[in-house]
């Protein structure tokens, strides 16, 4: 029997006037299933979103304290993905799943500065488009209760077009930072097996390989894991794996003033990592689980800037404007602990904590904290459901999530360099990269929903509150033109989203 799911969402933030700008978000998701008697099951799926944000400049020049007060910006993001999948089950405990898909993303952004005469000059302009055509297939075969093998292949053809220009200083012409147009391919394949050595020991082993045709860089990555069922309630596991990744497409096409039209990063290799992880799981009861997972990760061949603390491991901006080399390293050490109680009598809860240390070595050979080295993240989640209605068919649900995490990392301010900058743009002492840290953050979210389960058309009302604790996000620092001081740039965004959903 064929089935389908269709979901459209429009965020109520589009109806709000946020301070200094507007935000608009909407998305669409669908999936159609068509089972057949002899030819397997066909599925058609799709997802898309539109995300827009505009920031207005302050019209009253007497209120211009910071550079951002006289800046007007736009940020429009469009994304879509869709495909057709086919799954076929053979008579010998084997299955084949094949998918043909396409993805598309576009980012249109820009910033304009105004002077006291209300004359505007462009400061940044960005237009990037990415399209991926994907073919992937996976063959799974269960040879016995103790031996299963999976083989997969993926071919991704990536089309790209990007144009990014930035003015080096205010009122100067825009200069090309990153530009490229063309296509390349990423080819990957893997084979993995799960072998039950005994009733208590299970071995998982496999190998993964990939090739980037842009520069013919390739990698072969072994992965292995061993699991021991020590008792009916306790399990231990040890796993090792090698992983690699390509960079975002814009990195490969950076152009600098010294190289002219030549893209300086086209020959970058994959960033590679070695993972080692232990795992202990304990089933306290049918409804309660405890899991403890210490791990260590070593990264190498990380793209960095020569003789600098810069590394792509800290990248948060949407562009890179420098020549890079694969000489960086990284190291992550930590432990994850999770305790969860599954839903019973309408109640569930989970407590998890992560303690970690994340460091990297830049192109100058010095080890630093990574930008994301918060050191700890603690999550608490609790929810309660009540069955209501004449036949107890409706559900009132209340959920609460609290997150306590270490503050963002940042580099010390280089006051002299900042004051000497023509635009007083804040400069940082990169020889002490990310050595400072903001205060811890407490983030709270909640959801209250009421689901009415009608026979033909179930529907649901929901109210979601994001960051009701008022935690502040930090965006760096800004020079105050009135006081002559450098202030922290932060913002606390508290959102309440009301939604209504129909299922048919």
Positions of PLM-derived features:
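Structural signature of Gram-negative outer-membrane beta-barrels, strongest in the C-terminal barrel
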Residues: 144-148, 154, 177-299, 352, ...
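Surface-exposed extracellular loop regions of Gram-negative outer-membrane beta-barrel proteins
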Residues: 59, 106, 164-168, 213, ...
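Outer membrane beta-barrel strand-and-loop segments of large Gram-negative receptors
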Residues: 132-136, 177-190, 265, 269, ...
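Face-selective signature of the C-terminal outer-membrane beta-barrel domain
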Residues: 33-51, 72-215, 229, 284, ...
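Predominantly transmembrane beta-strands of Gram-negative outer membrane beta-barrel pores used
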Residues: 1-35, 43-47
């Amino acid at each position: 029997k064929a089935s389908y799911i269709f979901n459209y969402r429009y965020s109520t933030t589009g109806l709000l006037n946020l301070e200094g700008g507007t935000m608009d978000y909407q998305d669409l998701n669908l999936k159609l299933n068509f089972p057949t008697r002899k030819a397997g099951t066909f599925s058609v799926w799709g997802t898309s979103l539109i995300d827009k944000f505009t920031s207005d400049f302050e019209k009253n020049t007497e209120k211009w304290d910071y550079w951002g007060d006289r800046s007007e910006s736009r940020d429009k993001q469009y994304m879509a993905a869709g495909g057709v999948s086919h799954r076929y089950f053979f008579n010998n405990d084997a299955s084949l799943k094949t998918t043909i898909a396409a993805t598309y993303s576009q980012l249109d952004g820009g910033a304009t500065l105004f002077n006291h005469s209300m004359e505007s000059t462009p400061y940044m302009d960005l237009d990037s488009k990415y399209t991926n055509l994907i073919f992937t297939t996976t063959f799974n075969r269960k040879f016995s209760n103790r031996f299963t093998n999976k083989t997969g292949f993926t071919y991704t053809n990536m089309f790209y077009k990007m144009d990014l220009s930035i003015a080096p200083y205010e009122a100067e012409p825009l200069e090309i930072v990153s530009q490229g147009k063309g296509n390349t391919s990423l080819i990957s394949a893997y084979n993995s097996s799960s072998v039950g050595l005994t009733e208590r020991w299970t071995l998982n082993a496999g190998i993964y390989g990939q090739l980037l045709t842009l520069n013919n860089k390739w990698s072969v990555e072994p992965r292995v894991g061993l699991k021991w069922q020590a008792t009916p309630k306790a399990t231990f596991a040890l796993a090792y794996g090698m992983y690699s990744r390509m960079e975002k497409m814009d990195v490969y096409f950076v152009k600098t003033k010294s190289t002219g039209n030549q893209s300086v990063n086209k020959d970058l290799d994959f960033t590679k990592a070695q993972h080692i992880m232990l795992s202990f799981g304990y089933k306290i009861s049918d409804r309660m689980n405890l899991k403890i997972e210490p791990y260590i990760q070593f990264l190498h061949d990380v793209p960095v800037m020569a003789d600098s603390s810069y590394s792509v491991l800290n990248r948060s901006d949407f562009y890179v404007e420098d020549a890079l080399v694969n000489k960086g390293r990284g190291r992550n050490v930590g432990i994850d602990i999770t305790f969860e109680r599954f839903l019973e009598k309408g109640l569930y809860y989970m407590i998890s904590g992560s303690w970690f240390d994340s460091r990297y070595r830049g192109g100058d050979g010095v080890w630093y904290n990574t930008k994301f080295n918060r050191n700890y993240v603690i999550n608490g989640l609790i929810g309660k459901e009540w069955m209501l209605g004449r036949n107890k068919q409706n559900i009132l649900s209340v959920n609460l999530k609290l997150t306590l995490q270490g503050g963002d990392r940042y580099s010390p301010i280089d006051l002299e360099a900042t004051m000497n900058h023509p635009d007083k743009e804040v400069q940082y002492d990169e020889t002490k990269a990310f050595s400072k840290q903001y205060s811890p953050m407490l983030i709270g979210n909640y959801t209250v929903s009421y689901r009415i389960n009608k026979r033909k058309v179930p529907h649901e009302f929901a109210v979601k509150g994001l960051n009701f604790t008022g935690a502040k996000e930090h965006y760096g620092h800004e020079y105050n033109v009135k006081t002559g001081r450098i202030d922290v740039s932060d913002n606390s965004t508290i959102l309440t989203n009301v939604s209504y959903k129909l299922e048919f």
